[in-house]
From Swiss-Prot:
Subunit structure: Homooctamer; the c-ring consists of eight c subunits forming a circle, and each subunit adopts a hairpin shape. Component of the ATP synthase complex composed at least of ATP5F1A/subunit alpha, ATP5F1B/subunit beta, ATP5MC1/subunit c (homooctomer), MT-ATP6/subunit a, MT-ATP8/subunit 8, ATP5ME/subunit e, ATP5MF/subunit f, ATP5MG/subunit g, ATP5MK/subunit k, ATP5MJ/subunit j, ATP5F1C/subunit gamma, ATP5F1D/subunit delta, ATP5F1E/subunit epsilon, ATP5PF/subunit F6, ATP5PB/subunit b, ATP5PD/subunit d, ATP5PO/subunit OSCP.
Catalytic activity: H(+)(in) = H(+)(out)
Keyword annotations from UniProtKB, A to Z: CF(0), Hydrogen ion transport, Ion transport, Lipid-binding, Membrane, Methylation, Mitochondrion, Transit peptide, Transmembrane, Transmembrane helix, Transport
Transmembrane segments: 77-97, 112-132
Family: Belongs to the ATPase C chain family.
Source organism: Mus musculus (Mouse)
Disease annotated for this entry: This protein is the major protein stored in the storage bodies of animals or humans affected with ceroid lipofuscinosis (Batten disease).
Membrane-related topology note: Multi-pass membrane protein
UniProt-recorded name of the protein: ATP synthase F(0) complex subunit C1, mitochondrial
One Gene Ontology term from the biological process aspect of the record: proton motive force-driven ATP synthesis
Compartment(s) of residence: Mitochondrion membrane
Domain of life: Eukaryota
Taxonomic lineage from the root: Eukaryota, Metazoa, Chordata, Craniata, Vertebrata
A Gene Ontology term for the protein's cellular component: proton-transporting ATP synthase complex
Gene3D superfamilies reported in the protein's UniProt record: F1F0 ATP synthase subunit C
Length: 136
């Protein structure tokens, strides 16, 4: 007889205990604490409602800062690629001019175009690094 009584849980108790589990995180964080109601408390029941909140500690902030610096460092690696691209473009200009000096003007215009595209990619990588550092 005792086990039958333990298995019967009132529907009001189930509703009050599972209400916190069903709500999304934003509703749990933004809602005001509710006034105590006449519904039974779920502290004595086996169902425990987990309270979800954002907690920031010194350690988690340090991890976030380290992640920012690592991401910014990884983004600035592209600037080295830009430098290598510019060197390749002007090296090819010198080789092309040595092979056929009559194409000087056309080779130079292509070299300037290659320089601009390579420099733009380097500046884009630098911009992403600054965004990671200061905008996030």
């Amino acid at each position: 007889m005792q086990t039958t009584k333990a298995l019967l849980i009132s529907p009001a108790l189930i509703r009050s205990c599972t209400r916190g589990l069903i709500r999304p995180v934003s509703a749990s964080l933004l809602s005001r604490p509710e006034a105590p109601s006449k519904q039974p408390s779920c502290s004595s029941s086996p169902l425990q409602v987990a309270r979800r909140e954002f907690q920031t500690s010194v350690i988690s902030r340090d991890i976030d800062t380290a992640a920012k610096f690592i991401g910014a460092g990884a983004a600035t690696v592209g600037v080295a690629g830009s430098g290598a691209g510019i060197g390749t473009v002007f090296g090819s200009l010198i080789i092309g001019y040595a092979r056929n000096p009559s194409l000087k003007q056309q080779l130079f215009s292509y070299a300037i175009l290659g320089f601009a595209l390579s420099e733009a990619m380097g500046l884009f990588c630098l911009m992403v690094a600054f965004l990671i550092l200061f905008a996030m």
